[in-house]
Amino acid sequence: MKAHGSSDIEDIDLRRRFDEVIKQDERLVVISFWAPWCRNCKKIAPFVDQLSKANEKIFLYRVNTTFAEDIGAQQGIDALPTFQFFRGGKMLGDFKGSNMDAFMKALSNYV
């Protein structure tokens, strides 16, 4: 299932699928945790959409915490938007917030 809007980013709503995507080869997997009511999520969404199209070094997915509360709870999501970075099934780190410059700085630690 694709995320809201015209994005090519897949929305993950099942824990099984979440577990599958974070284990993808050695490329970086970025999971964006968001909700439709979250203003900051809407603020950064166009930037995230653009990033997913422009960077082939990463796999980018979204988890709508309104529908996939279990995944958000299991991942310890306590703020939106939150981005978690994975490689080979291991979480490398996370970023919370909608500041695009700070997000890119955090992302650059893993790409």
Where are these regions (language model features)?
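Intrinsic disorder
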Residues: 12, 24, 35, 54, ...
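Non-catalytic, surface beta->alpha helical segment in thiol-disulfide oxidoreductase systems
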Residues: 78-79, 84-111
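Local sequence-structure signature of Cys/Sec-based thiol-disulfide redox active-site neighborhoods
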Residues: 19-50
